[in-house]
Amino acid sequence: MKKFLNKIKSNKGNSLAEFAVTAAMMATLATTAAPRFSGVGEVGKQNQTMANLEKLGKMANQYYMDTSSPPTPNNPSGEGQGRIPGQERYDTQIGGYNRLTDVEAILNEQFNKWDDGEGGQWKSVFGLESANSSYVGEYQFTDESTDYGQGSGAYEWRLGLSAAEGPIKSPYQQGHYIYIVIPGGQQEIENPSTGESQLVECNECGPILVLADAYNPSKFYTVKSFN
């Protein structure tokens, strides 16, 4: 549990105490995003993909900060309320999960291969056109949108890249970066009597971003909270 919760990072500097309720609900989750591999080459790939996921998280944070500010000549992308690339608004869901506990089993060894059917609940970060064409036919995840402009995931993610950089690629041939967004505007709480979780309205609660490498999402993932 602690290993998973350590991956939930607030992009506003808030304490992880805010996630105490979530911690209780996810007490059965005991996975780690840093498996031990034999061989220097595999360790290098592991470290590289985790570094890439962290970079993607920072890109999302910068985008959230830019959109949260009012529009100005120096910040034309300002909207007055932050959102994650691909969201129409901060309370828009991306992918197939409406609450963080829905992801619990998925990140507990269930979704562990790029062609798993669970991938249908996820979206490509930079678009499938940037994926390894040898494996595109095996992927179950799809593009968030193929349009351009506000709310188009791949387009908005690419805004954080330099012209020379290009989409960030997984070091694994079968890998590809995917994501889901738990919508803001709500809070998941636990009923102390039943142990069941429920969603309540919370206007000040931001979205939660989960990024993963499709090579093995149960091992390579990161969680970012925008509360």
Where are the regions that the model predicts?
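N-terminal signal-anchor/signal peptide hydrophobic helix marking the start
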Residues: 14-23
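Membrane-proximal amphipathic alpha-helices
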Residues: 42-53
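Intrinsically disordered, low-complexity regions enriched in Pro/Ser/Thr/Gly and acidic residues
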Residues: 101-227
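Residues within membrane-spanning alpha-helices of integral membrane proteins
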Residues: 24-25, 52
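C-terminal juxtamembrane segment of a hydrophobic transmembrane alpha-helix
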Residues: 26-44, 64
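Extracytoplasmic/periplasmic/luminal assembly and interaction segments
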Residues: 87-103
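N-terminal leader/signal peptides at the extreme start of proteins
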Residues: 1-12
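Alpha-helix exit/C-cap motif
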Residues: 58-90
